[in-house]
Amino acid sequence: MPDYLKLKKSNCKNCYKCIRHCPVKSIKFQSDQAHIVKDECVLCGQCFVVCPQNAKEIRNDVPSVQAMLNSGSRVVVSLAPSFVANYPGATIDTMKAALQKLGFNAVEETAVGASIVKTEYEKIIAERRQKVIISTCCHSVNTMIQKYYPEALPYLAPVLSPMQAHCKRIKEQDPEAKTVFIGPCISKKAECDESP
């Protein structure tokens, strides 16, 4: 697993908060430093949230996005609706304007994908294909089931996440477009890498 989330050596103060809050216990402590056990991590971000020393670092994808913007390709943003939590007073229109000033060609809400996904869930329920359905919208949950609860794999809905559904729709409408997802979730980085 690439370094989506890593720990900065100099900042760790041995408080063990990350270890206590990790739902899958994928953090070990060695040589006065916390280390993420990559093969066990589900990228939920709890360690990042609870660290009082800012000792966690999330992979920076800005250089890759800048390269896309500089390539001359059409670049479309899929914007998670949670942006309103980080930018009080912002609307989709103000976000579109700001992102287009940065060079993006278009900005759409990931909610477009959520609508597609909702329709798929309705079909599964109406056709009674599965008695028990676990939503596949959260990549961390999907990863946790794959790694720790494989007996629950048959219950995962065979449906794309809203992000994937939206980006697929964008590429169907504009096959040459490159897509960039902007949202708060660390595990979405892995999801993007696993399903380009």
Which positions does each model-derived feature cover?
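Iron-sulfur cluster-binding cysteine motifs and their immediate structural context
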Residues: P2-K9, K13-V37, V42, Q46-V62
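Iron-sulfur-associated redox domains of electron-transfer enzymes in respiratory
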Residues: R59-P196
